[in-house]
Design a protein with these regions (language model features):
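C-terminal helical cap/extension that packs against the catalytic core
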Residues: 141, 151-165
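A short, basic/flexible loop-to-alpha-helix module at the beginning of a structural domain
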Residues: 101-111
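Hydrophobic, well-ordered secondary-structure elements that form the walls
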Residues: 62, 93, 105, 122, ...
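A generic secondary-structure signal
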Residues: 104, 132-133, 162
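Ferredoxin-reductase
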Residues: 4-97, 134, 140-143, 147-151
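Histidine-anchored nucleotide/phosphate-binding helix
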Residues: 123-137
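Conserved beta-strand elements of the Class I
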Residues: 113-117
Length: 165
């Protein structure tokens, strides 16, 4: 009875409007434009993403802040059989179903400084928060410590540009 019913009211349809693979970090960036009633999300939340109705949805952190324009993106680490094939299977214009947002990763604090520590793909909630701060700046100072095996290539350059925005 509960199969495919829980969360049904949180499902929206979107379209992939870009796919980019960052070879040096084995990460795929998937840009999505939602078509209808996405209520928005907070930095650090995730959604169940279904790129193909023949497959089960997978949970991925929403890597972008919400601007209210329907655009968002996911940074997905190529870790297993499913995620390692996404870059070759996903196409611009392809339909996608999102369910969410879920989770709570809070950045709320009355302290003047925050220290963020992330490793690898764990950077995604912090990237989303950087996007949110670019839209609505805060007086808090943020120190970000990002641990990765490679600090070169376009993926890292994009993360650095996001941090400096």
């Amino acid at each position: 009875v509960l199969f495919r019913k829980v969360g049904a009211e949180l499902k929206v349809v979107g379209v992939i409007d870009g796919v980019e693979r960052y070879t040096e970090s084995s990460v795929v960036r998937v840009n999505v434009k939602v078509k209808d009633r996405w209520a928005g999300h907070q930095a650090g939340q995730f959604a169940f993403v279904n790129f193909d109705d023949k497959e089960a949805a997978h949970p991925f952190t929403i890597s972008s802040g919400w601007k209210g324009d329907g655009h968002m993106f996911f940074l997905i680490k190529e870790l297993g059989d499913y995620t390692s094939t996404l870059a070759s299977r996903l196409k611009t214009g392809q339909a996608v179903t999102l369910e969410g947002p879920y989770g709570q990763f809070t950045f709320k604090s009355d302290k003047p400084r925050q220290i963020w520590v992330a490793g690898g793909i764990g950077i995604t909630p912090f990237i989303a928060r950087m996007h949110a701060l670019a839209a609505e700046p805060s007086k808090q100072t943020v120190d970000l410590f990002f641990c990765v095996p490679h600090v070169d290539g376009p993926g890292f350059a994009k993360a650095r540009a996001d941090a400096q925005a």
